[in-house]
């Protein structure tokens, strides 16, 4: 297997581990969020789970199609309990995912996988939307009280 393709597969497996972690993190956050924000944030966290699992499914399929073996292990998952920290952990996760996908997009371009480049751009757009929504939630001064 070409070394550049192998590096791409390794990166995609790292991305996959983080998508698993994001789905678990959002599931955890939906369960533990409490107080006045629970009624608003629980559905928000729950709505993100399917997006992250959709990304994980795509990554798994692509890794296998490229000749790799999809990981079954999730990346480390923070477990904050306060509303602000739940949102901040999610925000950091989304930012890191965008950065990883930008790197993966460059790797895919280098080996000529246009379909993967296009899908990564779509996933970057999804993650950017998640990031912006969390930033709006964090801009509420009551979250910081």
Kindly give the residue locations of the regions a language model identified.
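Iron-associated oxidoreductase/ferritin-like identity signal
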Residues: 1-145
């Amino acid at each position: 297997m070409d070394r550049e393709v192998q590096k791409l597969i390794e990166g995609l497996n790292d991305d996959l581990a983080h998508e698993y972690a994001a789905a678990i993190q959002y599931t955890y956050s939906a369960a533990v969020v409490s107080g006045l924000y629970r009624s608003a944030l629980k559905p928000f966290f729950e709505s993100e789970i399917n997006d992250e699992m959709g990304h994980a499914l795509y990554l798994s399929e692509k890794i296998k199609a490229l000749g790799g073996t999809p990981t079954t292990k999730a990346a480390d998952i923070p477990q904050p309990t306060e509303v602000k920290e739940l949102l901040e952990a999610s925000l950091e996760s989304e930012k890191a995912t965008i950065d990883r996908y930008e790197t993966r997009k460059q790797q895919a371009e280098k080996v000529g996988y246009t379909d993967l480049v296009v899908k990564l751009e779509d996933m970057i757009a999804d993650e950017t939307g998640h990031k912006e929504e969390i930033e709006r939630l964090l801009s509420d001064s009551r979250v910081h009280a």
